[in-house]
């Protein structure tokens, strides 16, 4: 069993992004810019936003956080996005989820200009991903693919099973693996006999937010297990969705939690922001 070290790879990617940002700045006078919008004061969301801001600073990317109160109306949020869409200093726009219940999340994500949608949630980018036409892929699934690539794990011809069908992780993960020529199965809350699917997986990706959902008997020997879940237990410890102690000895590769997929999400966001800046320079937006 070998650990897929997302922390180490994320540092490699961050260093490469920093180098490319320096080249872009020195050759074209351009510094990539990321705007993050945070509505409300959810502690977990604030922590994620702070992590993104620190990563941007380390990589030389200009970042700004717009903190808006919980009482912010949908129209106020849409107006803030419109201003950022037209801001020449901003290449990427990210709205931290979840949003308060009175705001229509789909409408907000659709309001972000597709060429600034570094989260890859705009329907145009979702469609491009599904059709394998480029665009922006969501950061977490993109980070998983980079991990597989780093460790020489080729999805082509393999049975890939994804547990969790969210728009943020599960569905784009399935699209990326399908684009890489894996035979892809997407499981969700209504899937019958989950184990019968997971036991057939050469590559198993799990992201639902349930500690110990995947146990040793549900995984075949030699599988690659990607634990995308992150759960804080009552004792304060962080665990994934996979029972690591029992499953790990059975795997060829497995991601730890923390230190696996999490750091890769931030690294992929930096990559997407750099990509947005480069694309904007090559194809000026009207």
Swiss-Prot record:
Residues involved in NADP(+) binding: 164-166, 189, 230
SUPFAM superfamilies: Aminoacid dehydrogenase-like, N-terminal domain, NAD(P)-binding Rossmann-fold domains
Molecular function in Gene Ontology: methenyltetrahydrofolate cyclohydrolase activity; methylenetetrahydrofolate dehydrogenase (NADP+) activity
Gene Ontology cellular component list: cytosol
Function of the protein: Catalyzes the oxidation of 5,10-methylenetetrahydrofolate to 5,10-methenyltetrahydrofolate and then the hydrolysis of 5,10-methenyltetrahydrofolate to 10-formyltetrahydrofolate.
Subunit structure of this chain's protein: Homodimer.
PANTHER family, A to Z: C-1-TETRAHYDROFOLATE SYNTHASE, CYTOPLASMIC, C-1-TETRAHYDROFOLATE SYNTHASE, CYTOPLASMIC-RELATED
Official protein name in the record: Bifunctional protein FolD
Natural source organism: Wolinella succinogenes (strain ATCC 29543 / DSM 1740 / CCUG 13145 / JCM 31913 / LMG 7466 / NCTC 11488 / FDC 602W)
């Amino acid at each position: 069993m070998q650990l897929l070290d997302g922390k180490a790879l994320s540092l490699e990617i961050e260093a490469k992004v920093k180098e490319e940002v320096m080249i872009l700045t020195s050759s074209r006078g351009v510094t990539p810019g990321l705007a993050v919008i945070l509505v409300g004061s959810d502690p977990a969301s604030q922590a994620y936003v702070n992590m993104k801001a620190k990563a941007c600073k380390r990589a030389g990317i200009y970042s700004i956080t717009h903190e808006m109160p919980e009482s912010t109306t949908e129209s106020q949020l849409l107006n803030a996005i419109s201003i950022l869409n037209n801001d020449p200093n901003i290449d990427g726009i990210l709205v931290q989820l979840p949003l308060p219940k009175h705001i229509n999340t789909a409408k907000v994500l659709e309001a972000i200009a597709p060429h600034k949608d570094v989260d890859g949630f705009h329907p145009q980018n979702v469609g491009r991903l599904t059709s394998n036409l480029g665009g922006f892929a969501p950061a977490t699934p993109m980070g998983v693919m980079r991990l597989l690539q780093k460790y020489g794990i080729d999805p082509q011809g393999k049975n890939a099973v994804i547990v969790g069908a969210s728009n943020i992780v599960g569905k784009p993960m399935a699209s990326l693996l399908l684009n890489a020529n894996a035979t892809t199965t997407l499981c969700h809350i209504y899937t019958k006999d989950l184990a019968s699917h997971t036991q057939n997986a050469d590559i198993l990706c799990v992201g639902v937010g349930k500690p110990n959902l995947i146990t040793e008997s549900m995984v075949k020997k030699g599988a690659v297990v990607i634990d995308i879940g992150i759960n804080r237990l009552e004792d304060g410890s962080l665990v994934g969705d996979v029972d690591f102690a029992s499953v790990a000895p059975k795997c060829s590769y497995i991601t730890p939690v923390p230190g696996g997929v999490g750091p890769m999400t931030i690294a992929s966001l930096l990559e997407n922001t750099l990509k947005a800046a480069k694309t904007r320079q090559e194809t000026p937006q009207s």
